[in-house]
């Protein structure tokens, strides 16, 4: 292939190889290869010249080969575990995430996918509410860690002081809004509407919703919005939402049940409390969970968010950033919504004498 200048390139029937591009442009094969993977060490003018010539010549990188070669270049050979990715948590204890129902599933999914992609996922604790994030940020930089997954956070956490200019980041959940990063979360509004619609199909008419105020804030009121919309779309009696500031106090829940007289309740953490109050489920009250854990499948009706899948896709998104050398805050962050699945379970039953809508 003859190339005298980038403007003189004629697109051949077959795209050129990187060695042909290098020979035609008078640069080394290594320079072309590094420019095509957007290596920041290549001079900008040289990189732009190579990229323009490659585009005009019809060159297209194979994304699978590109990903594989990035792994090989980082370690010198292909290994089952390679570049370290941080999994950042900020709960009250360093190991709290290991027993947290959804966060532990996020980690398992991300860890499995990281190994499949040749990375090694390692947990880092930012301190309670992120109070120790600056120190951890220095550790990440010193170890050359280029990517991190941020676990779900609350709205009132300390500002995370990380080296955002040298870190590719994906945050799990709707709560992290401190800086513009790519995020992935379950589609909470759709999950709520799906729950409500299925309960209506079972014949429930007075469907209530119980939520903790911190959960409502963390997901930016998306469950609340979905519940109010579902009442309008799917009908049924309009009950007052029960918001509480305590996961422990059951008497306010008892009072709400007595006042509103629901025949079904949508929630998450409230199911054990209903059992403590000796509410007969499903005979007296139907219950649908907005977040069924894997261990609860077959025990509860409601939405299975598949948190392991969310963790895996978070790792996919992060790997893409690393392969493209996108290690800084994006100008326009993306929000990926994952759909949940309705799961039948023994906590609901068809209501006698009532037709489904």
Roles of regions detected by a PLM:
Residues 182-209, 249-254, 304-326:
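Hydrophobic alpha-helical segments within soluble ligand-binding/sensing domains
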């Amino acid at each position: 292939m003859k190339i005298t200048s980038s403007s003189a390139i004629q697109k051949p029937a077959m795209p050129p190889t990187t060695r042909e591009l290098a020979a035609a442009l008078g640069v080394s094969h290594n320079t072309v290869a590094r420019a095509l993977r957007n290596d920041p060490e290549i001079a900008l003018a040289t990189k732009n010249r190579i990229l323009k010539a490659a585009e005009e010549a019809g060159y297209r990188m194979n994304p699978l080969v590109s990903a594989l070669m990035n792994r090989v270049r980082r370690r010198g050979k292909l290994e089952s575990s390679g570049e370290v990715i941080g999994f950042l948590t900020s709960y009250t204890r360093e190991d709290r995430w290991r027993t947290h129902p959804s966060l532990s599933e996020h980690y398992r999914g991300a860890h499995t996918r990281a190994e499949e992609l040749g990375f090694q996922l390692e947990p880092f604790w930012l301190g309670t509410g992120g109070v120790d994030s600056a120190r951890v940020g220095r550790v990440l930089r010193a170890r050359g860690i280029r990517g991190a997954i941020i676990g779900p956070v609350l709205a009132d956490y300390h500002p995370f002081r990380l080296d955002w200019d040298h870190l590719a980041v994906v945050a799990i959940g709707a709560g992290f809004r401190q800086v513009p990063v790519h995020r992935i979360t379950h589609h909470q509004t759709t999950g709520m509407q799906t729950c409500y619609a299925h309960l209506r199909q079972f014949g429930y008419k007075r469907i209530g919703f119980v939520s903790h105020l911190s959960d409502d804030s963390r997901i930016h009121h998306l469950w609340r919005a979905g519940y109010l919309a579902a009442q309008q779309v799917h009908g049924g009696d309009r009950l007052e939402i029960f918001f509480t500031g305590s996961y422990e106090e059951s008497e306010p829940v008892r009072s709400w049940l007595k006042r509103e007289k629901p025949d079904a309740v949508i929630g998450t953490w409230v199911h054990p409390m209903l059992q403590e109050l000796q509410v007969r489920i499903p005979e007296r009250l139907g219950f649908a969970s907005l977040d069924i854990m894997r261990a609860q499948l077959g025990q509860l009706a409601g939405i299975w968010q598949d948190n392991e899948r969310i963790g895996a896709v978070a790792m996919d998104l992060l790997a893409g950033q690393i392969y493209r050398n996108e290690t800084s805050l994006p100008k326009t962050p993306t929000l990926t919504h994952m759909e949940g699945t309705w799961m039948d379970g023994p906590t609901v039953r068809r209501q006698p004498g009532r037709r489904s809508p």
